[in-house]
Amino acid sequence: MAELTPMMRQYLEIKKNNPDSILFFRLGDFYEMFDEDARLASKELDLTLTSRDHGKHAKPAEEQIPMCGIPYHASEAYIARLIAKGYKVAICEQMEDPAAAKGLVKRDIIRVVTPGTVIDAACLDDKASNFLCGIYIDSRSAGAAFCDITTGKAHLTAFTGRDRVEHVINELGRFSPAEAILNDGAYAEKALTGALTEKFRCRVENGGERRFLLNEAEKNIRKQFGEDALKSLPAGNPAAAMALGGLLNYLYETQKTDLSHINDLDYYEQGRFMELDLTARRNLELTETLRGKEKKGSLLWVLDKTKTPMGARCLRSWLERPLLSVTAICRRNSAVAALVDNTIAREELTAAMTGLGDMERLIGRIVYGTAGGRDMASLRAAIEKLPAVKEQLSALSDRRISELAAELDTLDDIGERIAAAICDEPPFSVREGGFIRDGFDEEVDRLRHILKGGKGVIAEMEAKEKERTGIRTLKIGYNKVFGYYIEVSNSFRDQVPDTYIRKQTLVGGERFITQELKDLEHEILTASERVVALEYELFTKLREEVSGEAQRIQKTAAAIAETDALASFAAVAVRNNYCRPDVDESGVIEIKEGRHPVVERVLKDSLFVPNDTFMGEKEERVAIITGPNMAGKSTYMRQVALIVLMAQMGSFVPAAHARIGVVDRIFTRIGASDDLSAGQSTFMVEMTEVSDILHHATKNSLLILDEIGRGTSTFDGMSIARAVLEYCADKKTLGAKTLFATHYHELTELENTLPGTVNYNIAVRTKGEDIIFLRKIVPGGADRSYGIEVAKLAGLPDKVVQRAKAVLKELEEENGVQYVAARKETDQVSLGAIGEGEVLDALRRCQPDTLTPIEAMSLLYELKKKLQ
């Protein structure tokens, strides 16, 4: 260290305290990176890698330290690229003016930017939240905390029991965190860390146990959210407080600034929102499509017609967290109904919110201290629109909308304060001046006058001095040696005042200076620096004043966001001819002329065929749906699930009429794919998902099961499908509402033997050798699968299709006899060689009502093995 320059010693000391971050080290107008940081940054940012001496004596090139740099004023774009790749960036600033510093300039970390703590607009999707997550798990409980520091909103929940990790993973689906801080117990859960890194592309950090200590967690929660917030947390499960405490500790360590805007804590318990696992979210394509991972083609794409970024985020949060309270659901869809019924108010309200901007994130940046003049101008422009929004809300007669109107503060005083101080079109940077409005501050105006009219100011002084002294030939000049001076000819030498100080004698006269002239010279020469510094001082004062009103602004922003989301629901309902659903706790799902909300929008030039649905508590609880591939079975089942989910969001739904009994969870088992990275086959993935469903579903759940058992042999698959179907239908085991699509036509016989089960099929019309899918759900089971006809529609060569028909005919003729013979032969073997008693004893000993689906499958495999 003794051989290092003072600057390099300073750098290494700061780097030692931030080993996991790329250190942006401020040197003049650049952020410099050194050594391994430089190598990494040059690679990731396409920067030229150079080198410099790091000691007091010159070194050979191979011993010099690698370095690269970026202009400080362009840092946001570079930081955004690093954050997008999952890196942390520590910003080290000069803490004093280098020109005034005595010796080495003081430097320190002002903040650490991470994927979950980024606030720069360039790094963010304005229609999606950016959550940092804190997770605490021990042997009995689990807590999960989520915070978006750009808006100041925090959410917290906790779980107990053996399924606590699965519940936490499901919560991740609601928030899609960008970064997660885990205690040791959470970090040891491979399923959790795997979901974070693989499903959410989330940066994961093991925070150890130190960050999650309960006493410190309670202290931090009390400091950040107040005593009442701490008391609202469950006393019997400290995991919630510890998860939030770990998150807050991480924020305090990395942000090093005022975080007072983080003041909205929402603690929720299991049972407040519909729980959706990652499989259901993916299969229902709630926020992105399965194949392209795009918003277009998702349910969010259909529903989001919001006009503000905060409204878009609010609507998305409703989609991620459908409600379970009938009262809360009806309250929301009542507000939507009021907007649907009043076209003029709805359209004027929408117009008033158009271009209103992102008040939530604006106030976040203002409190954070990173907002510029343009942010202030944007906030002022948003405030100017608030009276029109409030006026339209006040005109509507709905309880929730009236509450929103009352919560919406027009913030006139804040808008006037900003308008008085900030010009209409401020420059990008507040470090270069030019954004304080003329007339706001006398000193700024005076300095600007000097800057704009330096010659004019000198001329004014010259005229004043001529008049005061009576020296007609007096003139003020300038040179690089003396600066400004007063020149008087010899003929007026006797009239020179005593306050003039002689500086130079010429042939025809003399040159003088005065204190007033020197002061003016100083002002002219330093006016630019002084006005920039003064403008920044005035701006920081204004920013602090507006920061003090953060809660008022946040409350109004929340009211605007909810209003925007409700208006979007209403606009979509009117445009797409949706109906207001009747939501209750009856357990009944009754839909008349239901439509798939996404498919009908994609098929712009085609008529979508609507279908009815009835699922009761006792009758028609389970629907067995048969029919050919491509006929629309999966679309129909997804349609029912989406209509239920939309209803519980508080939205209108695509149907002529709908009655929705609230469901606690929606499960889906649709399609199949190998999970090679986990070493799982298609069938294993299918069985794992089915197992999860049967273990976690309740009688109040909605199950969407498509082609269970198709990943194995026909008899094995049919046995598993039947066992699963019976388990779902039987009220003693589950009794959940289930849509069960299958190609095993033999299962349709269960309609006559399994209570609550009914058959449906997709209507098909044949025309010669061709088939036409009518897309209509009708009672009864399908008589055949039309597999070869579907293959023909898919474009298989005619020769292949004809050969398939011939093979099918042969199989039908042969197996029709051989299958019966095989059954008889098997019966004889089982009774003779193995013995009737062994098989029957095993069947007598088993208790079907207590068997899990997996145990039932294992028993079937065991008996089958004995019979072979």
Label for each model-derived stretch:
Residues 329-332, 352, 356, 454, ...:
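Intracellular alpha-helical coupling/juxtamembrane segments of multi-pass membrane proteins
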Residues 172, 177-185, 191-194, 516-549, ...:
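Conserved catalytic alpha/beta cores of large enzymes that bind or transform nucleotide phosphates
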Residues 92, 115-124, 258, 396-400, ...:
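Active-site phosphate-binding and catalytic loops of NTP-dependent enzymes
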Residues 209-224, 274-278, 290, 381-460, ...:
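Amphipathic heptad-repeat alpha-helical coiled-coil/stalk segments that mediate oligomerization
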Residues 372-375, 848-868:
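Short, amphipathic C-terminal "tail helix"
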Residues 1-338, 354, 358-367, 371-460:
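Charged catalytic and DNA/RNA-contacting regions of genome-maintenance
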Residues 35-36, 237, 307, 312, ...:
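ATPase nucleotide-binding head domains, primarily ABC-like/P-loop NTPase cores
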Residues 38-55, 147-175, 494-525, 605-615, ...:
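Extended active-site and interfacial segments that coordinate phosphate-rich ligands
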